[in-house]
């Protein structure tokens, strides 16, 4: 943190640095096993959106989903996956080589803007699945429509506490209303980081709900289902 220097309306650098936040990417292998039965159909994957506040494990979950869907597992043949890693948080690449295990059938574009990277992968890498972290901009939304209309499956993450939060953001609301995503995974850290609260389908049906969620958030979930229906 410090003083941000602008040039022609764009951020050029930061001076008078007062604090440094060092983030270390790490893996939790196997953390996605609970959600896999809800996001696959035969040997295909549903368009999936992971919803989570900061520091609740959405990138960690996404990374492990990429690894397992790429490698494959009993009953599921591995898929080719293209990853756009805009902030180097998924693969933690060094000189283009992922330091995290993201699967044997995974291609990664490191430090590439998501909107450009998704289109590049479609045109040149023939992925079955495209995975991106933290969508939200108008350019991201436009690229997402290109992905889903070319036969690729999409797995993405977004900041938020619930589906209601997503619907309050105009670009993302359109994705929900048009049922672009077929699965919604909502995370929290009430008990532990990466806790899976609920999993919805595109019609608003609850496929999974944590036991404590049934008691503490029943009204919230009913409202979310009503909004999607």
Residue ranges with predicted function:
Residues 125-185, 189:
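Conserved P-loop NTPase nucleotide-binding/switch module
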Residues 29-34, 108-116, 135:
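A general structural motif
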Residues 4-6, 27, 45, 87-91, ...:
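Conserved nucleotide-binding/hydrolysis micro-motifs of P-loop NTPases
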Residues 3-16, 183-229:
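Conserved P-loop NTPase
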